[in-house]
Structure formats: C-alpha cells, structure tokens
Amino acid sequence: MIHIITGSTLGGAEYVGDHLSDLLQEQGFDTKIHNQPNMSEIPAKGTWLIITSTHGAGEYPDNIQPFIQALQNTPPNTSALRYAVVAIGDSSYDTFCAAGKHAYQLLGDIGAKPLANCFTIDVQEHPVPEDAAEAWLKRVINRF
C-alpha cells in the first residue's frame, strides 16, 4: 500500500496526489490518499509518498501541520517505512520548497528509508505541476 499524504493550501498538492495515485493504480499499486493526514490513521510501514507545498515563510500548509508535529514530537518506529517526497514551490521565494525539504529530512532522521531524492517542482517552470510529477514518477516507479 502506498499512502499518499498531501499538504495543500490551494489544492495544487491534492491535484498532484490524485494524479500520481491514478498513475500508480494503473501500474497495479494499491494507494490511499490522505488529504487530512492523521498519524493515528496511517501505518508507519510500507510506503509513504508525501506531496506538499510550502506556505508563508517556509511553513507547512495547515492541513498537514498536525501530522508533521506528531512525527516530530512522538516519532513512530519507521524501520519498515519507505518514503518519497514531492515538494511544490515557487523559486521566486527564498523558502522555495522548504516544507517538502524539511519533511524529507525529518523522515530520514527518524529512520525511514528514502526511495528517491526529494523532488522539487518549481511552478515558475511547471505551471501544471502534475506534468512534472508524472515525469518524475516514470523515472522512479521501479523503486516503489
């Protein structure tokens, strides 16, 4: 099972999550999307695909903040967890993709195994982030 965990303010990360979920299902993977992620509802094993934008001064969107805080405050045993992170941002800000980069580092710090490097999508270059995310998934799908 691939748990797709989104952090979104305006819906862009949710759209990317929906699109990647469809593509993964077409390849035979089981997926579950968590647009309001809750640590108690997502097992710390299998695969997590975190897709998040960055809000304000490098912060997480409101919907994913409690999930990230739970990971930081009471990290679960992640020895059986693999993860990938897609970070969506705007390179005209100095906090470009800060939330996604932090999530990637946090998961590694608490013992989860990365499937790929943190993938950043610059909306200045990719106004439709689903397209960039799809190209990335095609490159790394064999790692899932």
Swiss-Prot record:
Domain named Flavodoxin-like: residues: 2-141
Gene3D superfamilies: 3.40.50.360
Needed cofactors: FMN
Any GO molecular function: FMN binding
Pfam families: Flavodoxin_1
Keyword list, A-Z: Electron transport, Flavoprotein, FMN, Transport
Family indicated by similarity: Belongs to the flavodoxin family. MioC subfamily.
Function: Probable electron transporter required for biotin synthase activity.
Name of the protein this chain belongs to: Protein MioC homolog
Organism encoding this protein: Vibrio cholerae serotype O1 (strain ATCC 39315 / El Tor Inaba N16961)
Phylogenetic classification of the source organism: Bacteria, Pseudomonadati, Pseudomonadota, Gammaproteobacteria, Vibrionales
